[in-house]
Regions:
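Conserved core segment of the aminotransferase class I/II
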Residues: 1-5
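Flexible, glycine-rich terminal cap/loop adjacent to redox cofactors
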Residues: 6-8, 12, 19, 24-145
Length: 145
């Protein structure tokens, strides 16, 4: 069905915004989806930006490559943009590009198991910390005895 649709309506089948790209520098710079500025222009202040520095990653520390970070932009709990500055960022961005395309949120992404120790465990750590922080923001809903 997609092949026929794309044949008659080229460009309609793929969401170009979620297509990842990478600049192969040292460290690599990879991106998918919206930048923070684009997300704020489209969604206003209903945007959250989450950051995980590689200084907290065991593999990066072991390799001596702690310069870098993973940044994820969300709107209404869904990932709308991702940026990675890290060794092998071009290999790690695919997970976040798929999350953008499929409308996955950080809480769902936090359930994914990453191989340890790899730099990509920082994606899981970012997702877990973001989900935990979001849950903490709702703690006022819970009645205490």
């Amino acid at each position: 069905v997609r092949a026929v649709r794309d044949m008659f309506f080229p460009g309609k089948g793929k969401v170009v915004a979620s297509v990842p790209w990478c600049t192969f520098t040292d460290p690599e710079l990879a991106h998918a989806g919206m930048t923070e500025a684009e997300a704020r222009a489209q969604h206003g202040d209903d945007v959250d930006v989450w950051r995980q520095d590689l200084a907290h990653n065991d593999r990066a520390r072991a390799d001596g490559t702690t310069a870098g970070a993973i940044i994820v932009i969300t709107h209404k709990k869904r990932i709308v943009g991702a940026h990675i500055l890290a060794p092998a960022a071009g290999e790690m961005i695919h997970e976040l590009a798929l999350a953008i395309e499929e409308g996955v949120g950080l809480s769902e992404l936090s359930q994914f198991t990453h191989v340890y120790p790899t730099v990509s465990t920082s994606i899981g750590r970012l997702a877990g910390e973001a989900a935990f922080e979001k849950a903490g923001r709702l703690s006022w809903l819970v009645k205490r005895r």
